[in-house]
């Protein structure tokens, strides 16, 4: 990632996201800490923090091949689980002390089956995520979280009390608030941060101890006040999509003259735009309500598309967005349908929309540049 940002905290974020194993995880492990890998932002990582574990969001950063994992998946599975599983088969996830999967989609669901069959991780569980966002589904997920809570206590010999859960929720909410403050700076006419520079900040929060991340985030917010952004961008853009942890994708977009000022992705605002409710009596009930209903959902949740498009429009207005780019991993059926509906709604709202299909590991830069250039020209044409 090319950047002019001079900040020790920002450098730490970049180091934590440049690969899978990073200095922060190494230090945690050397001190005797345990690491819990997990797929999907609907897994309640507060539970791991309360158990004294380091939550680590699974990714395939640095992967160059799916040679080993191709035998584990069909030819219509997307490249995210392929690359992530390949890294595991190469031994790059041997530092994990456990893994929690979830039935967020059939592609990720297959990781659970293959992980159990081929890897020796002693604690591997799968959570059952409901399909809707109503009261019965909150009750269902409440039971799922309590089930996982009991399994963690038994396997790791820890006690996850309500008090420890509330402490974890408070810490995670404080981090969410700090992340929102980072995004606030992107509302200016000359944002001091590009989209490509913001992404490592967000991914780092899922790749290092939470207290350490909070401290670095506070330091960075002190540094960002000294940064000066450049103006004259062709358009203010928003990214909507799912599994996007690679800054290079945004770099290519921004090299064409646009600047990404906000997003609705599972490594972006959907993680932190709204907090867990700390006013209820039961911390598990608070988590169940948050992960099923309170936080902005993704296409995995049925019947919630009207709220999702309202959320996108709300952010687009707040950040003065000129156009929206929908990114989708090839073979992701959920986002394929979602982007079709999003495109229809945004056309009615007269907001330019471009859908870009991609592989998990960056490729096809020439085609990406051409399509983004044409999109920016369309936006500029609408102004004249």
Where are each of the predicted segments found?
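Hydrophobic, well-ordered secondary-structure elements that form the walls
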Residues: 324
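Acidic/His-rich segments in extracytoplasmic proteins that coordinate ligands and/or metal ions
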Residues: 83-154
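A charged, amphipathic alpha-helical module
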Residues: 1-34, 142, 146, 150-274, ...
């Amino acid at each position: 990632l090319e950047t002019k940002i001079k900040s020790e905290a920002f450098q730490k974020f970049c180091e934590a996201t440049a690969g899978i194993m990073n200095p922060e995880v190494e230090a945690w492990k050397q001190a005797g800490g345990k690491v819990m890998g997990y797929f999907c932002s609907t897994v309640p990582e507060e539970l791991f923090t309360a158990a004294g574990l380091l939550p680590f969001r699974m990714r395939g950063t640095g992967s160059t091949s799916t040679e080993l994992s191709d035998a584990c998946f069909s030819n219509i599975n997307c490249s995210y689980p392929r690359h992530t599983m390949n890294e595991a088969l190469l031994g790059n996830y041997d530092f994990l002390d456990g893994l929690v999967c979830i039935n967020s989609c059939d592609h990720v669901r297959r990781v659970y089956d293959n992980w159990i069959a081929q890897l020796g991780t002693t604690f591997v569980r799968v959570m059952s995520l409901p399909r809707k966002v109503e009261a019965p589904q909150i009750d269902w997920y409440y039971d799922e979280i309590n089930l996982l809570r009991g399994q963690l206590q038994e396997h790791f010999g820890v006690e996850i009390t309500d008090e420890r859960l509330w402490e974890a929720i408070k810490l995670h909410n404080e981090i969410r608030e700090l992340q929102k403050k980072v995004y606030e700076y992107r509302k200016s006419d000359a944002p001091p941060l590009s989209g490509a520079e913001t992404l490592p900040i967000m991914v780092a929060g899922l790749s290092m101890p939470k207290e350490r991340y909070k401290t670095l985030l506070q330091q960075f917010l002190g540094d960002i006040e000294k940064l000066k952004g450049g103006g004259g961008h062709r358009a203010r853009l928003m990214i909507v999509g799912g599994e996007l942890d690679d800054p290079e994708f945004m770099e290519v977009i921004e090299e064409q003259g646009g600047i990404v000022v906000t997003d609705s992705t599972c490594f972006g605002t959907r993680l932190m735009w709204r907090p867990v409710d700390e006013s209820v009596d039961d911390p598990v009930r608070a988590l169940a309500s948050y992960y099923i209903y309170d936080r902005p959902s993704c296409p995995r949740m049925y019947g919630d598309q009207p709220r999702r498009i309202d959320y996108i429009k709300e952010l687009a207005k707040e950040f003065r967005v000129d156009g929206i780019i929908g990114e989708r991993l090839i073979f992701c059926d959920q986002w394929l349908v979602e982007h079709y509906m999003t495109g229809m709604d945004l056309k009615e709202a007269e907001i330019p929309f471009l859908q870009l299909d991609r592989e998990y590991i960056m490729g096809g830069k020439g085609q990406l540049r051409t399509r983004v250039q044409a999109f920016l020209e369309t936006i500029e044409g609408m102004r004249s």
